[in-house]
UniProtKB/Swiss-Prot annotation:
Record's keyword annotation contains Methyltransferase: no
Organism: Anaeromyxobacter sp. (strain K)
Quaternary structure and partners: The glycine cleavage system is composed of four proteins: P, T, L and H.
The protein's name in its UniProt record: Glycine cleavage system H protein
Lineage: Bacteria, Pseudomonadati, Myxococcota, Myxococcia, Myxococcales
GO biological process terms, semicolon-separated: glycine decarboxylation via glycine cleavage system
Cofactor mode of binding and number, as noted: Binds 1 lipoyl cofactor covalently.
Length: 128
């Protein structure tokens, strides 16, 4: 299981990466492994507001339907539209090509409140 050091993580298994002043969001390798083959993803539209801890979309796999939760509050400024035609990208490359949305944060400090890689690794080990 891959847990990149440069990302921040949530207890709901989303990751967040700073990209300039924006935050890119996706689901972790652990999450995609638990889901199995992703067959559908529903994401918000550019311009939609998102609130930390609240649902911003849905991922459907052969095993389950899971909500996606925003790691920070802000406004969606970019959506990975190719995922609608190729949702399996989330399984193949969850941290790069499988990113989901980019958020312009209301408060950039929200990112610092998320778990670092070591804390997330410990959290996942408790879940297994």
């Amino acid at each position: 299981m891959e847990i990149p050091e440069d990302l921040r993580y949530t207890r709901e298994h989303e990751w967040a990466r700073r990209k300039g002043s924006a935050i890119v969001v996706g689901i972790t390798d652990f999450a995609q492994q638990q889901l199995g083959d992703v067959v559908y993803v529903e994401l918000p539209d550019v311009g939609d507001p998102v609130k930390k801890g609240e649902s911003f979309g849905v991922v459907e796999s052969t095993k389950a339907v899971s909500e996606l939760f925003a790691p920070i509050s802000g406004k969606v400024i970019e959506v990975n539209d190719p995922l609608s035609d190729a949702p399996e990208t989330i399984n193949e490359d969850p941290y790069e090509e499988g990113w989901m949305i980019t958020i312009e944060p209301s408060d950039p400090k929200d990112l610092e409140a998320l778990m670092d890689a070591a804390a997330y690794k410990a959290f996942v080990e408790e879940q297994e």
